[in-house]
UniProtKB/Swiss-Prot annotation:
PROSITE patterns: SECY_1, SECY_2. Component of the Sec protein translocase complex. Heterotrimer consisting of SecY, SecE and SecG subunits. The heterotrimers can form oligomers, although 1 heterotrimer is thought to be able to translocate proteins. Interacts with the ribosome. Interacts with SecDF, and other proteins may be involved. Interacts with SecA. It is found in: Cell inner membrane. The central subunit of the protein translocation channel SecYEG. Consists of two halves formed by TMs 1-5 and 6-10. These two domains form a lateral gate at the front which open onto the bilayer between TMs 2 and 7, and are clamped together by SecE at the back. The channel is closed by both a pore ring composed of hydrophobic SecY resides and a short helix (helix 2A) on the extracellular side of the membrane which forms a plug. The plug probably moves laterally to allow the channel to open. The ring and the pore may move independently. GO terms for biological process: intracellular protein transmembrane transport; protein targeting; protein transport by the Sec complex. It comes from Rickettsia bellii (strain RML369-C). The gene is secY. Keywords: Cell inner membrane, Cell membrane, Membrane, Protein transport, Translocation, Transmembrane, Transmembrane helix, Transport. This is Protein translocase subunit SecY. It is a multi-pass membrane protein. The keyword Ribosomal protein does not apply.
Length: 433
């Protein structure tokens, strides 16, 4: 009986993995289906021109869908943006904050609000894409074959439906597969560009533009970089939490202790993404602008990859968003109040305000180290890309996303296997009884 249960659990895990792979294949297949009315040759030249801008980063996150202007061109970014906006608003807007406290019902309402906002953001972005495409004329001709109202309407509908389909597929992976669906869709998009980046590097080495020793050093550097990311992403500061003893009749209950883990990098990959988006926005405007403004050209030059001003601003913005997003993710006052509510306390700290201030003190130190870690991880690839013209798909943000998704998925698989073994053990105990 126990063997049959274990076999059933194992088959369920395999089915979940197969389902996840199947859905990800659908996502990749959709990224090669172009929207109607586009000149592929003219579009290719524009995509190549914007490789170093914010479009290059979003093209990387979409797995090349934006560069090919496929039905998944907007990728799942509108949904992520909507989720972040709702998360930010839940801190400042009281009704949303109250919804978060309503448990599962509140969570469903917040998810519904995120979907509505996703449709709105995707519609605005899709319309912006349609208008931009109509205004672009290359050496080979206009990008849009027959511009007009019909093209705008069909483009908006196609791109919005594509985003909502990706969002739904991501939810299906989360519910019926393994791992976080949204993260895995971004992950598969990023790694799809890795083979071309490796081929590009070897091509540069073959032509003599990149020495073989440098190519080997870059490969070794990638391995070291991934190891560093894994170390820092798994790093935690454990705070001792004590529960008081309670006497009920002649028996004494409680008195146990546990640990509250605080991640070194609480903010995750959000700070580099936000920082990159802000810094690369002027360069993107310049690429789409037909006028040769001196101010715009100067901004484009000084905010280019690897430039000193770009790096300084990049680090400053990463540090700022690290503190900003950590304050949203971890509410010190709320956590301290929850501990006091359950009778728990930090040894040596009074429950309430004193505990909250202690959390702030610890988080500030962790965030400084975490911000420096994120800055270093993101700057090193920037310098390499600037010097050796390595593809953007090997940027620091890419490494952070890929490693985080892999770690999260492996953790979920381990948790699933552990829970299956636990259920098997409990069933065995019940049978014996």
């Amino acid at each position: 009986m126990n063997q049959n249960f274990s076999k059933k659990s194992s088959n369920d895990l395999i089915n979940r993995i197969i389902f996840t792979i199947f859905v990800l294949i659908i996502c990749r297949f959709g990224s090669f289906i172009p929207i109607a009315g586009i000149d592929a040759i003219a579009l290719g030249s524009i995509a190549e021109k914007n490789q170093s801008g914010i479009l290059g980063m979003f093209n990387m996150l979409s797995g090349g869908s934006l560069g090919r202007m496929s039905i998944f061109a907007l990728a799942i970014m509108p949904y992520i943006t909507a989720s972040i906006i709702i998360q930010l608003m839940s801190v400042a807007y009281k009704p949303l904050e109250n919804l978060k406290k309503e448990g599962e019902a509140g969570k469903r309402k917040i998810n519904q609000l995120s979907r509505y906002l996703t449709v709105l953001l995707a519609s605005l972005q899709a319309y912006g894409v349609a208008v931009s495409l109509e205004s672009i004329v290359t050496n080979t001709g206009p990008v849009v074959i027959i511009p007009g109202l019909f093209f705008k309407i069909t483009t908006v509908i196609t791109l919005v439906v594509g985003t909502m389909l990706l969002m739904w597929l991501g939810e299906q992976i989360t519910q019926r597969g393994i791992g976080n669906g949204t993260s895995l869709i971004i992950f598969i998009g990023i790694i799809s560009g890795v083979p071309s980046a490796i081929i590009s590097m070897f091509e540069l080495s073959r032509k003599g533009a990149l020495s073989p020793l440098v190519a080997i050093a870059v490969c070794a550097g990638v391995v070291i970089l991934i190891s560093i990311i894994i170390f820092f992403e798994k790093a935690q500061r454990k705070l001792l939490v004590q529960y008081p003893k309670r006497q009920v009749g002649n028996k004494i209950y409680g008195g146990d202790s546990t640990y509250m883990p605080l991640k070194l990098n609480t903010s995750g990959v959000i700070p580099p993404i936000f920082a990159s988006s802000i810094l690369l926005f002027p360069a993107t405007l310049a690429n789409f602008s037909s006028s040769n403004s001196e101010i715009m050209n100067m901004l484009t030059y000084y905010l280019g990859h690897g430039k000193p001003i770009y790096i300084l601003l990049y680090v400053a913005l990463i540090m700022f968003f690290s503190f900003f997003y950590t304050a949203i993710v971890f509410n010190s006052e709320e956590t301290a109040n929850n501990l006091r509510k359950y009778g728990a306390y930090i040894p040596g700290k009074r429950p309430g305000k004193n505990t909250s201030e202690y959390f702030d003190y610890i988080l500030t130190r962790l965030t400084v180290v975490g911000g420096i870690y994120l800055s270093v991880i993101c700057i090193i690839p920037e310098l390499l890309m600037n010097k050796y013209v390595i593809s953007l798909s090997l940027g620091g943000t890419s490494f952070l996303i890929v490693v985080n998704v892999v770690l999260d998925t492996l953790t979920q698989i381990q948790t699933y296997l552990f829970s299956s073994k636990y259920e098997s053990l409990m069933k065995k105990v019940k049978l014996k009884n």
